[in-house]
Amino acid sequence: MTPAHPTETTQDWIPKSPVCMMYGEQVSREQLIRALAEQGGWFLVGNSVTEQHFFSMSCLLYPHVIATPDYAPHGGSGPRDWPQNLYLNPSSPLVDQLKPPAGFDIKRTPLVTFRRVDLLFEPSELDAIHLSMHNSSDSVPSTLFGPEASESYNLSPDKYLSIFTAPLPEANYKVLLVSTAGHWTTASLPGARDPSDVQKEATNPAVYKTFVEAVRVWTKKVSGVLKEPSVGQGVKNSEKQVLIRAYLPGHEFDCHKETGPLTRVREFTREWYNWSWIGRMNEAFKAAIQAQGNPQLRFLGLDKPALLRPDAHSLSDCLHIQIGAGIFEGWARYIWHFMEDLRA
């Protein structure tokens, strides 16, 4: 766990609207465990911030879950793209109280899974999308990547969607929770640089245009998979939900001097990474979902509680968030309430 900021404390985001007040109600770990075991697990796909969200789930659900892989034999760490899972702990007192579906295997069926995917697609797929945008013109590079590209971790949606839709006992996922935008930069995708302005940094509009097309292709693909017939036991494809969590930029300057929450979201005053573009990218993903018109794909604008919390960052930087600050914990609570609403 990353060291906490010395003035950081847990803060709860409580909605003011009477209609949304219930989303501020606390959710016990027992309620979360019951939902994950009986109604279906959560599959988290994204970058290092999503990985932190996964880690926070292990804390929220302790001692009722066992996390894998075991990093101890590997010196305490491993490849960043290793699959990570939370399984129901056989010694949990809740085991005898739960009623999981037929076919659920306590040793094989994850409650929560994380896969590191920075750019939604694997490189060859993203290259194909980019070339199709330009009608395979010779004026654009053959690849967005290349030897000068910064490191990113990627996986084809064919792979992670096949995991998401797999039947029991291998899987029983109800929710696919996806968030992306932070690695969509000219560092990760140097082939997207404007040839007339190759020095342009992460805010190059060509990256944004590629992102807009990529999320359009992605939402269409995901919607198609959800319409496919289900195989085997478990949550049916028609019952699954794909939730796009608004991506979260960091805070400018020295966030570690902040002593508490802000009263309003600060506008960016300079070009830090691609942070000033994140809002537009979130809106692009939201628009792609709306255009698809599939009620199983939904956009969750959960970024504001974190945008108001520059004090909640870990000491390492002003992007990653301290476990226990209330941000990730609030996301889990909101998603639980959201899924309960859909069941009502």
Placement of each model-derived feature along the sequence:
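A compositional signature for long Ser/Thr(±Pro)-rich, low-complexity
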Residues: 1-344
